[in-house]
């Protein structure tokens, strides 16, 4: 049975300046976005993206992720706590970022970028969809290093079951790593390959929505659920699972629309 290594959350400390692993994982996510974005632009030159446009996308995306992710954590998961401690809302370095909030923040940011650049919203989301999952993987690895978002109790016979000593002595699923592998690496492989060929408008975005929503919904059964505003709607389903449902529904609707558009030619 494995035991969590209890990493020091600070990766580098020089005097009073400390760089945390969680921040480095965000930096890695942003670097991967640029590297993959340029590779995607090279393999699909007809899409009309260049290095400057990708850098602009990153700037808008970073703002959307940070602002939306934090607001999502505040509104979806801990509204009572943050109403009592409003100064903590700005303490993003302590963790506490909601994917679904960050996702909505990025959508708003991409719409704003589209207004400035003259590009269509779905043209933008279809381009960035293959670039996002590796960043999600990096974020989940950051969660694992931080020792947060641990899994539900697991059978002691499970070879990779892990004890998180600061929680209890029970073997648990390392759900952060499940999510890094699933909604990170597996989803990246699916969307990256799908986006390699010309697709109808909205189709790549649809595959991302369906893939992420489905994989996250399943992963939540292995992760200790976070208390949230939808936690009590149906026993056994978490707030994150409820937030994944509209992602899948919208994704299916977009895929159907894209298929009809292709059929009409």
From Swiss-Prot:
Family per UniProt?
Belongs to the Lgt family.
Transmembrane intervals? 17-37, 57-77, 89-109, 127-147, 176-196, 201-218, 233-253
What is this protein's name?
A: Phosphatidylglycerol--prolipoprotein diacylglyceryl transferase
One Pfam family assigned to this protein is LGT
Primary role:
Catalyzes the transfer of the diacylglyceryl group from phosphatidylglycerol to the sulfhydryl group of the N-terminal cysteine of a prolipoprotein, the first step in the formation of mature lipoproteins.
Kindly give the PANTHER family that the UniProt entry links to this protein. Answer: PHOSPHATIDYLGLYCEROL--PROLIPOPROTEIN DIACYLGLYCERYL TRANSFERASE, PROLIPOPROTEIN DIACYLGLYCERYL TRANSFERASE
- Which enzyme class? transferase
As recorded in UniProt, its EC number(s) are 2.5.1.145
Matching entries from InterPro entries are given as: Lgt (IPR001640)
Q: What domain of life?
A: Bacteria
Q: Name one GO cellular component term.
A: plasma membrane
Pathway-wise, it operates in: Protein modification; lipoprotein biosynthesis (diacylglyceryl transfer)
Quick one: which residues bind a 1,2-diacyl-sn-glycero-3-phospho-(1'-sn-glycerol)?
140
What's the gene? lgt
Q: Which organism is it from?
A: Azoarcus sp. (strain BH72)
């Amino acid at each position: 049975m494995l035991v969590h290594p209890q990493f020091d959350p600070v990766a580098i400390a020089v005097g009073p300046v400390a760089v945390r692993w969680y921040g480095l994982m965000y930096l890695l996510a942003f670097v991967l976005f640029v590297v993959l974005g340029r590779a995607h632009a090279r393999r699909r030159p007809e899409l009309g993206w260049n290095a400057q446009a990708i850098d602009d996308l990153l700037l808008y995306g970073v703002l959307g992720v940070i602002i939306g992710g934090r607001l999502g954590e505040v509104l979806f998961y801990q509204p009572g706590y943050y109403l009592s401690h409003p100064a903590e809302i700005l303490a993003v370095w302590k963790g506490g970022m909601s994917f679904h909030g960050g996702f909505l923040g990025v959508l708003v940011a991409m719409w704003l970028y589209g207004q400035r650049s003259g590009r269509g919203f779905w043209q933008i989301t279809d381009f960035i969809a293959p670039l996002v999952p590796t960043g999600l993987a990096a974020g989940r690895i950051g969660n694992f290093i931080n020792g947060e978002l641990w899994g539900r109790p697991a059978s002691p016979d499970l070879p990779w079951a892990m004890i998180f000593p600061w929680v209890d002595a029970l073997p648990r699923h390392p759900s952060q790593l499940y999510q890094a592998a699933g909604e990170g690496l597996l989803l990246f492989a699916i969307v990256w390959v799908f986006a390699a060929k010309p697709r109808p408008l909205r189709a790549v975005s649809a595959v991302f929505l369906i893939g992420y929503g489905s994989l996250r919904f399943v992963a939540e059964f292995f992760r200790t659920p976070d208390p949230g505003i939808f936690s009590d709607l149906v026993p056994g389903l978490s707030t994150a699972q409820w937030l994944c449902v509209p992602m899948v529904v919208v994704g299916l609707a977009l895929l159907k629309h894209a298929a009809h558009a292709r059929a009409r030619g």
